[in-house]
Amino acid sequence: MSETATWQPSASIPNLLKRAAIMAEIRRFFADRGVLEVETPCMSQATVTDIHLFPFETRFVGPGHSQGINLYLMTSPEYHMKRLLAAGCGPVFQLCRSFRNEEMGRHHNPEFTMLEWYRPHYDMYRLMNEVDDLLQQVLDCQPAESLSYQQAFQRHLEIDPLSADKTQLREAAAKLDLSNIADTEEDRDTLLQLLFTMGVEPHIGKEKPTFIYHFPASQASLAQISTEDHRVAERFEVYYKGIELANGFHELTDAREQQQRFEQDNRKRAARGLPQQPIDQNLLDALAAGLPDCSGVALGVDRLVMLALGAESLADVIAFTVDRA
């Protein structure tokens, strides 16, 4: 395909046909399990507070709103889906567009397809098993292996991420020739993420999908803290062939604690010179009303299709990437 023929799709028609078949297979997977498909808004008056996520922002001007209302394209359908769960919908899944104003490349596009689902009364491990079932069905891969975050660091970096101080983390970074970044970084979780990305990720999920679970409590996000070890959160991620595929939680149900985490995120944003984000009060109200004990996971569909087709880039499985949109 000529590089100048930008009117043409980035993916081939045969690949788009295969993609459609995978989307249908995903829907059958959940239909067979009695999980309800839902649709939620792509825009919201509130957004994520995570310091590592950057949402797109737009402005609505219409009848009754002459001054305009700020709206954010959703980075994930999580908040709306939790409101449905609190309203009593039962197990749900969604295939939807999500948007992040971040990088673009082989594994990233600002607009992408997300598969997100929630299972009331599932703990983290039971949901991990279901994710594994889906991956085996779509990718025809081996059953996954599982490592705790602590085990992964000890195996590949010979350091305990739960007890190491910042000096020890910088020493580990120096062994990876990352001192130019690590020596000026004061945030411990950013150091851990640097080590994980550069020192752990390249070694996991080569032959089979790998679950990494029990992330540090400081990286809990919207996950519960483990009742067995308060140093870790009931959160997991899935990696396969160099790609992060999914991120899941045993979901936090405490509205007050969730609000405190959002506020802490905004304080971190302010310290880094980033804009503070509006907190989703509707989500907090839903948690206060009673979110059922549940686990949920978000999975990147474009990356899943890329792996299933043996493609080299998301551009091979997306009809029009952002540079052709």
Swiss-Prot record:
The keyword ATP-binding applies. Changing H108A: No effect on activity. Pfam families: tRNA-synt_2. Gene3D superfamilies: Bira Bifunctional Protein, Domain 2. It comes from the Bacteria. It catalyses: D-beta-lysine + L-lysyl-[protein] + ATP = N(6)-((3R)-3,6-diaminohexanoyl)-L-lysyl-[protein] + AMP + diphosphate + H(+). Homodimer. This is Elongation factor P--(R)-beta-lysine ligase.
